[in-house]
Amino acid sequence: MSDPHLKEKVVVIAGPTASGKSDLAIKIAQMIDSEIISEDAFQIYRGLDIGTAKPSKDDLAKVKHHFIDIKEVDESYSAYEFARDARIVINQISSKKKIPLIVGGSGFFLQTLLGDRRISDKDNPIVPKKAGIENRLYNALLIGLNTERSQLYDRINQRVERMFEKGIVKEAENLFRQQGNFQSKKAIGYREFAGYFANQYDLSEVETLIKRDSRRYAKRQLTYFKNQFPDMRWFDTKQITENPKLIIDLVKKFNQF
């Protein structure tokens, strides 16, 4: 096992959808003068803004974000490609004497980036000889956000309702106007529109389906993170919203160590 103190440091903010990851990450990044690496499988796509809950223009102006709007909707982007590209960005951020903040809900992307999971590609030059936490490529502080299940589901439902208020229907129309079975069309918040555009059900049903699929996804995310990242430190979203200093102090201590 290699000494973690000799490795580049990264801070990870993870958790289920609608748990408040992005807001917390921006606060931390501003406090420690850092940059954010988005490890979201769908925020990479231009034009998929509302359904993927991308940071606002104001938030993007406050803190530099990476891996937002880097692909067209008809392009694919694998976990391997993300890990390859993100490791270059981590090196660049670290060279500025900053700690990269990795933020998102894709456990598979995160495992691949950190080196916890081996990708089945014999020619893959970035996979460590041994995979697993003990052979992780970075000295990582993993922070998980969660809250009581009913409160999380309420947050999800409210987010979906805001999506419709902001114009998610137009984004979905633009996406499905393009022919092809793209990876981007599999994103929750968009894939549920397929039946609507096929005249199989109305918009109220689309909203119901997005809420249902988002809740199910959040449950799977929690299971995945808790099973695959035993060293993740968990905090309640409500507690952190009221007192973000708890996390900020933890990150500052990690930065100094």
Curated annotation (Swiss-Prot):
It catalyses: adenosine(37) in tRNA + dimethylallyl diphosphate = N(6)-dimethylallyladenosine(37) in tRNA + diphosphate. This is tRNA dimethylallyltransferase. The gene is miaA. The keyword Magnesium applies. Monomer. Its cofactor is Mg(2+). One of its GO terms (molecular function) is ATP binding. GO terms for biological process: tRNA modification. Substrate binds at T17, A18, S19, G20, K21, S22. The record marks S106 as: Interaction with substrate tRNA. ATP binds at G15, P16, T17, A18, S19, G20, K21, S22. InterPro entries: Dimethylallyltransferase, IPT, P-loop_NTPase. Its EC number is 2.5.1.75. It comes from Oenococcus oeni (strain ATCC BAA-331 / PSU-1). Keywords: ATP-binding, Magnesium, Nucleotide-binding, Transferase, tRNA processing. PANTHER family: TRNA DIMETHYLALLYLTRANSFERASE (PTHR11088:SF60). Belongs to the IPP transferase family. Catalyzes the transfer of a dimethylallyl group onto the adenine at position 37 in tRNAs that read codons beginning with uridine, leading to the formation of N6-(dimethylallyl)adenosine (i(6)A). Disulfide bonds: none annotated.
